[in-house]
Amino acid sequence: MDPEYSELFERLNKQLDNVEDVLKPLKDAESIFELAEGKSELEQAKLYITMSYAINSTLYSFYKLNGIDASERPVMQELQRVKNYISKIQQAEKNVNPKTEAVNTSNAAISSSSSNRPKVAKDAATRIIKHHT
């Protein structure tokens, strides 16, 4: 076998091992809700949107590998919707953990910044996951 190919196969094998390690909690859990247990609402939203992205990007890859024009499929709308949610989650993270806040802020500043934090739409995130499972 060509040494270049053997190196590629070796890298692929290592990457697949990494994927297996990452997916092990999914395999062991009985439901996605079990995975979300004990996490903050923001972490739950990130979990749900990551799962949705993984499912939709896998479907997109399936279409591309089989020569199907994915641009006309609903998966493209779903991927765009997921991208929008990712942006919203990133914005929520910035609002929850603002890096510009000084370490020694007063209690008034802390309480006013926490009242401006956006709420994570837990019901919406749950509906997204139910729709894709």
UniProtKB/Swiss-Prot annotation:
Keywords: Cytoplasm, Exosome, Nucleus, RNA-binding, rRNA processing. Residues 102-116 have a biased composition (Low complexity). Its main location: cytoplasm. GO terms for biological process: exonucleolytic trimming to generate mature 3'-end of 5.8S rRNA from tricistronic rRNA transcript (SSU-rRNA, 5.8S rRNA, LSU-rRNA); maturation of 5.8S rRNA; nonfunctional rRNA decay; nuclear mRNA surveillance; nuclear polyadenylation-dependent mRNA catabolic process; nuclear polyadenylation-dependent rRNA catabolic process; poly(A)-dependent snoRNA 3'-end processing; regulation of gene expression. One of its GO terms (molecular function) is DNA binding. One of its GO terms (cellular component) is nucleus. Residues 96-133 are annotated as: Disordered. Belongs to the C1D family. Component of the exosome multienzyme ribonuclease complex. Interacts with cut3. PANTHER family: NUCLEAR NUCLEIC ACID-BINDING PROTEIN C1D, SUN-COR STEROID HORMONE RECEPTOR CO-REPRESSOR. Required for exosome-dependent processing of pre-rRNA and small nucleolar RNA (snRNA) precursors. Involved in processing of 35S pre-rRNA at the A0, A1 and A2 sites. This is Exosome complex protein C1739.07.
